[in-house]
Amino acid sequence: MSVALWQQCLNFLQDELSSQQFNTWIRPLQAEDGDANELCLLAPNRFVRDWVNDKYLKRINELLRDLASGKPPKVQLTVGSRRNVAMSSPRDLGAPVSATTMNASRPTEAPAVHAAPRAKGDYADEQEIDRLREREETPRRGGGERQVQVEGSLKHQSGLNPNFTFETFVEGKSNQLARAASRQVAENPGGAYNPLFLYGGVGLGKTHLMHAVGNHLAGQRENAKVVYLHSERFVADMVKALQLNAINDFKRFYRSVDALLIDDIQFFAGKERSQEEFFHTFNALLEGGQQMILTSDRYPKEISGVEERLKSRFGWGLTVAIEPPELETRVAILMKKADQAKVDLPHDAAFFIAQKIRSNVRELEGALKKVIADSHFMGKPITQDFIRESLKDLLALQDKQVGVDNIQRTVAEYYKIKLADLLSKRRSRSVARPRQVAMALAKELTNHSLPEIGDAFGGRDHTTVLHACRKVQTLKEESADIREDYKNLLRLLTS
């Protein structure tokens, strides 16, 4: 009875939450009837359980009270899974997906942003792990001189940047989950979130968080062997080891680390021998309880040129997306960087830069460095006018890239309507809502005035544009769909 009530509750939660929130936190929960009018919700791991308990349990209880004909069931939120139980499947989510029961030596896969549930066939069979256990090392060929060269090139160098710590990382809505997951890994390495897979565009903080975890682990234990490297360095080390007939030294080095942090894993694409070696390294580290953190510019399943068995393993722990920072976070980043540089940056100046530079943190910091340098060399205070002059080339390039016409075409394509209809006088919701969204985007992404934006949308009055902007802001707060649409369009226009 309680499970049926949970299915109704899911329908409301799906309407109220964004698709990212629902798929990440609610959809993975498995429901079963407990004793004495109890509803047991089973989370795949402690991280999901704690997050749901803090953020969503209150709303779940409210919905159950509203939906129950009598006394609402008491919710028991625990970590666990059942054999052959169907995952929660509200309307419009398709047929129920059977939960995969994995060998105890493998961590349960945590939910991933935008990730579809995996089929049983995605996981490697037990024989692969058995073969790894039984595999004997091939005797090494080659002389002692070559051996010294390879061991020297693979000596423990962490590669960590001491400036990248949790304390210097600016948290916001766009990276809150990634930071929380990284902190959990730093406190409990080799646990349920192994590997931790962070993905997102360039300059969003993936590398910073990876270093922050590494620095924390290295600081906890004096002899901790924490290694950070780019995926291409892993490939280069393997190639050198093969050339010197010392592949066993390569294997011993990478399989003896306490934590292995590999950046830009997508560069393994097309490198079959490197993928083969990393596959076995991955298995060895996982079985040894050694932590792995991987980053990529895209979701694991979307990395082309990488074997399916590797992509499947990338999702065995926790997969988290990092989004471009929202305005408030961009301002906070600028203020923190200015404080670190001991520069007096007025808040309105930081706000102005943050409004203009939206794509990623790297470009944001680059713009601030230029403004600070120009201010220092010219002996002038940092004001909005000064920033406008200092960054005029960058701002002109951005305006050229994100013009009103580009916004109009992108919005029309996104909503699958004709551009002519978007600019017409038609007032049907299927056209009016995209038009309002396009106007709001034009106000946020360009330097055009409201009258100029109105002219570009079929000669409309500036008050119409102002109304559209206010309407979209309200809709973003009330509607998960509009909020998701707006975020997707921002990404399309600024990436």
From Swiss-Prot:
GO terms for molecular function: ATP binding; ATP hydrolysis activity; DNA replication origin binding; lipid binding. Keywords: ATP-binding, Cytoplasm, DNA replication, DNA-binding, Lipid-binding, Nucleotide-binding. Residues 376-495 are annotated as: Domain IV, binds dsDNA. Residues 83-158 are annotated as: Domain II. PROSITE patterns: DNAA (PS01008). It is found in: Cytoplasm. SMART domains: AAA, Bac_DnaA_C. Residues 159-375 are annotated as: Domain III, AAA+ region. Plays an essential role in the initiation and regulation of chromosomal replication. ATP-DnaA binds to the origin of replication (oriC) to initiate formation of the DNA replication initiation complex once per cell cycle. Binds the DnaA box (a 9 base pair repeat at the origin) and separates the double-stranded (ds)DNA. Forms a right-handed helical filament on oriC DNA; dsDNA binds to the exterior of the filament while single-stranded (ss)DNA is stabiized in the filament's interior. HAMAP family: DnaA_bact (MF_00377). This is Chromosomal replication initiator protein DnaA. It comes from Chromohalobacter salexigens (strain ATCC BAA-138 / DSM 3043 / CIP 106854 / NCIMB 13768 / 1H11).
